[in-house]
């Protein structure tokens, strides 16, 4: 059976016409799949029963449910999925007073190898399809409460760019889930060639994982720095800034004694000079087997004051779901080593 979930309106239209159906059936199908929680094609009563039966001979909606749900003491929920290729991956729902955020994955595992991230330590298992990415949003019970999506789960979105771009098209299109592009943020380590492509045709907000402004130091914790210098990524963004309502931000995992002193703060200010952006400081989230430490509160506050003093708009992003392995850098999708 061929899954319709993960297909664009153009692709669904092609399928309908191939089966000698009327073109308008495609819009009815996409609306039911992406807006109405339809689990079977038989639910699409706006198209003739005879065509539904014909469609069911070779096609299915393609949605599937998580195989495990974990809830944190802070009400964060982590969902574990397994797709048809047996790739496991996770998404995290974080309710808040103003925003209810869903963090979704784009790969099972990751091949970027960032030293502070547990996801990278499990290695790369496989790319997710647009179907798998969109399904993380469609399949959870909090779907209608979500008003913000962050593509910051397992994997590097720019390493699976075609499927990620297609998934965001489905999420934001009027014929799809009609989720506002300005309420979706994609996080990347800054793979240069893909960053160029994204900046030519941006489709959501962008967050770049900075973590250290010095080339040699960044390379020691993020091996991709050697081929994808952060300075070049920043220059690309300066040359082609995002236009409102889309925005760019930077992320910085704070590691005690590694990247949180005045020297780093000054270099960050120099690097980001000329970009209207926000720097999100993320305290490193502990995982077994790592030598890194999260900064103390006085160390972190001093770093924030230093950044602000140099003109960098920076604040601390609160970690959620640490007790269930749902915080930034902790997600492994049931692939624990």
Regions found by a protein language model. Give the residues of each.
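Short linear Ser/Thr-Pro motifs
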Residues: 70-72, 105-106, 187, 209
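P-loop NTP-binding catalytic core
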Residues: 86-94, 98
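Canonical Radical SAM [4Fe-4S] cluster-binding loop centered on the CxxxCxxC motif
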Residues: 95-132
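Conserved AdoMet/S-adenosylmethionine-binding subsite of the radical SAM
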Residues: 142-148, 153-317
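Auxiliary Fe-S-binding modules of radical SAM enzymes
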Residues: 1-89, 238-247, 252-337
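Generic beta-strand structural signal
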Residues: 77, 89, 100-104, 112, ...
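Ferredoxin-type iron-sulfur electron-transfer modules in oxidoreductases and energy-metabolism complexes
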Residues: 131, 135-143
């Amino acid at each position: 059976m061929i899954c319709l979930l993960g297909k664009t309106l153009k692709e669904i239209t092609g399928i309908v016409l191939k089966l000698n159906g009327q073109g308008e059936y495609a819009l009815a199908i996409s609306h039911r799949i992406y807006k109405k929680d339809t689990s079977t094609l038989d639910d699409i009563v706006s198209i003739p029963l005879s065509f539904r039966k014909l469609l069911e001979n070779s096609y299915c909606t393609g949605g599937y449910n998580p195989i495990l749900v974990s809830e944190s003491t802070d009400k964060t929920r982590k969902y574990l999925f397994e797709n048809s290729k047996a790739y496991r991956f996770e998404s995290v729902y974080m309710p808040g007073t103003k925003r209810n955020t869903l963090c979704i994955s784009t790969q099972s595992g990751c091949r970027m190898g960032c030293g502070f991230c547990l996801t990278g330590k499990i290695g790369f298992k496989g790319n997710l399809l647009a179907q798998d990415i969109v399904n993380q949003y469609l399949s959870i019970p909090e779907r209608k409460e979500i008003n913000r999506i962050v593509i910051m789960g397992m994997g590097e979105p720019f390493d699976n760019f075609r499927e990620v771009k297609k998934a965001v098209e489905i999420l934001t299109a009027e014929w799809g889930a009609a989720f506002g592009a300005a309420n979706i943020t994609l996080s990347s380590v800054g793979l240069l060639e893909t960053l160029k492509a994204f900046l030519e045709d941006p489709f959501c907000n962008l967050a770049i994982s900075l973590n250290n402004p010095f080339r040699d130091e960044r390379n020691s914790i993020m091996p991709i720095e050697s081929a994808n210098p952060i300075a070049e990524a920043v220059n690309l963004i300066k040359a082609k800034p995002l236009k409102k309502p889309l925005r760019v931000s930077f992320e910085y995992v704070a590691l005690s004694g590694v990247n949180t002193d005045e020297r780093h703060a000054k270099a960050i200010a120099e690097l980001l000079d000329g970009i209207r952006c926000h720097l999100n400081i993320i305290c490193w989230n502990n995982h077994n087997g790592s030598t890194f430490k999260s900064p103390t509160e006085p160390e972190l506050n001093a770093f924030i004051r230093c950044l602000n003093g140099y003109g960098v708009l920076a604040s601390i992003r609160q970690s959620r779901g640490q007790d269930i392995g749902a915080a930034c850098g902790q997600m492994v999708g049931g692939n624990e080593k």
